[in-house]
A protein has these predicted regions:
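Basic/polar, cationic surfaces and motifs that engage anionic cell-wall
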Residues: 25-26, 30, 46-62, 66, ...
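Substrate-binding clefts and substrate-entry loops adjacent to catalytic sites
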Residues: 132-134, 147-159
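Solvent-exposed, acidic/flexible segments
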Residues: 82, 110, 141, 156-164
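Short, small-residue-rich loop/turn micro-motifs
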Residues: 93, 150, 189
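N-terminal catalytic cores of peptidoglycan-degrading enzymes
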Residues: 2-138
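Short loop/turn motifs at secondary-structure junctions
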Residues: 83, 144, 179-181
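Short coil-to-beta-strand
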Residues: 139-147
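Soluble periplasmic/extracytoplasmic beta-strand elements of cell-envelope proteins
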Residues: 88, 118, 147-149, 186
Length: 221
């Protein structure tokens, strides 16, 4: 049986369909190549992306700070800070305890909490964690904050004069060192609603006075 002979029009249409299929195939191949290339570039850039520089001018504290870094463990994990967006003020919640008492507690192998600094009853300041590492004090804000625990003589959580003055000085330095302002200083309470630091939560005006003192101290930098 002889085959069916195509008309010239049908031959023309068949050629056009074949050319269209070739163009579509070429387009798909080019598109796939572009996608693979884009993915490859993204992966390369991600792998070679420089880590964000921590916004701290120096990791070295002032001379009045006693550096007594706690050992790495549950409390000090060694995880690096992403950046510094706030300074968080806490109170130790253990009336009459000293800065050294609290630092040594942080250093126990089974302790899973710590702060960067502890301000003591005599105005002494101890650094427990490096400024480029996260502490374990401010819940979901540990990765972008510096934490300061503050000692207090009585249950009301009010800081004595020596402690208060050192806290103002340290907080102002931390702000200046990290490019922050007094408004960037917050309470643990502002993160979780916890009554910490107690006196500054119970007395909002005292908290505002503290921020004003930090702002005034910043003028010295």
């Amino acid at each position: 049986m002889s085959g069916i002979e195509l008309t010239n029009y049908e031959k023309l249409m068949l050629k056009r369909r074949k050319r269209r299929k070739k163009r579509i195939k070429s387009f798909v191949i080019i598109l796939l190549v572009l996608i693979v290339t884009a993915v490859g570039i993204f992966v390369y850039l991600s792998a070679n992306k420089k880590p964000k520089k921590l916004n701290a001018e120096t990791l070295d504290p002032p001379d009045y700070v006693s550096v007594q870094l706690i050992d790495k463990g549950k409390a000090r994990t060694g995880v690096k800070l992403i950046e510094i967006n706030n300074i968080v003020i806490h109170y130790v919640g253990n009336p009459g305890s000293t800065a050294q008492n609290n630092r040594d507690y942080f250093n126990k192998h089974d302790t899973d909490v710590c702060s960067h600094f502890v301000v003591g009853l005599d105005g002494e300041v101890i650094q427990c964690v490096p400024l480029d590492e996260k502490s374990a004090a401010s819940n979901n804000r540990n990765l972008d904050t510096i934490s300061v625990e503050v000692c207090h003589p009585y249950d009301d959580g009010k800081f004595n004069e020596a402690t208060y003055n050192s806290l103002v000085t340290l907080t102002a330095w931390l702000c200046d060192n990290s490019g922050l302002k007094a408004k960037d200083v917050i309470r643990h309470y502002d993160i979780t609603g916890k009554e910490c630091p107690k006196y500054f939560v119970d007395n909002e005006s005292a908290w505002e006075e503290f921020l004003a003192a930090v702002k005034a101290e910043l003028k010295n930098y």
